[in-house]
């Protein structure tokens, strides 16, 4: 495997369309875009793979629940001997309005427990991530991130996921700097 793309979320139907599952929704979109299925049970998660631009890519949805995402991801990284800079993690971010997408090469967990778990298990912050804005909570944070998107927000989220997927294509074709220029170039509204 050349790349691992992991989307963060919580398993189970009741969480499918919740804000905290933006990463899972992105992986589902990527699977469809690259004509694969994320249905093989491996690495404490669901996986699928595809080839694009002469790169082999593993899609991963950890089934460990958010706060233990690192347990699943580190297994895949170690099995395929993928360097952290070839691990792309997609997740929700309450720091951005709904539909904003941002990419960076490395950084702290920003208060996100799933990312915190990955950093702890990998022993490094040096992995790229794509953050999908889910809005700033006006209420209890746990209740907010586990709530479903409002109808008026759904189009913004799916456009953000489309933009993230296009960024992944650009990354595989032309590298991370081009992908970051595309993703960070403007705000999706």
UniProtKB/Swiss-Prot annotation:
The keyword DNA damage does not apply. Monomer. GO terms for molecular function: peptidyl-tRNA hydrolase activity; tRNA binding. It comes from Caldicellulosiruptor saccharolyticus (strain ATCC 43494 / DSM 8903 / Tp8T 6331). It catalyses: an N-acyl-L-alpha-aminoacyl-tRNA + H2O = an N-acyl-L-amino acid + a tRNA + H(+). The record marks 92 as: Stabilizes the basic form of H active site to accept a proton. GO terms for biological process: protein quality control for misfolded or incompletely synthesized proteins; rescue of stalled ribosome. Pfam families: Pept_tRNA_hydro. The active site is at 20 (proton acceptor). It is found in: Cytoplasm. Belongs to the PTH family. GO terms for cellular component: cytoplasm. This is Peptidyl-tRNA hydrolase. TRNA binds at residues 15, 65, 67, 113. NCBIfam families: pth (TIGR00447). The lineage of its organism: Bacteria, Bacillati, Bacillota, Bacillota incertae sedis, Caldicellulosiruptorales. Its main location: cytoplasm. It comes from the Bacteria. Its EC number is 3.1.1.29. The record marks 10 as: Discriminates between blocked and unblocked aminoacyl-tRNA. The gene is pth. Keywords: Cytoplasm, Hydrolase, RNA-binding, tRNA-binding.
């Amino acid at each position: 495997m050349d790349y691992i793309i992991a989307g963060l979320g919580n398993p189970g139907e009741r969480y499918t369309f919740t804000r905290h599952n933006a990463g899972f929704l992105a992986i589902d979109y990527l699977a469809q875009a690259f004509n694969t299925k994320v249905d093989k049970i491996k690495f404490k998660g669901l996986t699928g793979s595809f080839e694009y631009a002469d790169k082999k890519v593993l899609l991963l949805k950890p089934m460990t629940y958010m706060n233990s995402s690192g347990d699943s991801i580190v297994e895949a990284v170690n099995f395929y001997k993928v360097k952290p800079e070839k691990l792309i993690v997609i997740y929700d971010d309450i720091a951005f309005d709904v539909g904003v997408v941002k990419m960076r090469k490395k950084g702290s967990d920003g208060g996100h427990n799933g990312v915190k778990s990955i950093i702890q298990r990998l022993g490094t912050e040096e992995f790229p991530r794509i953050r999908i804005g889910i809005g700033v909570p006006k209420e209890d944070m746990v209740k907010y991130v586990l709530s479903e998107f409002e109808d008026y927000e759904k189009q913004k989220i799916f456009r953000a996921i489309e933009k993230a997927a296009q960024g992944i294509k650009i990354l595989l074709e032309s590298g991370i700097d081009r992908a970051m220029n595309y993703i960070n170039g403007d705000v999706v509204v």
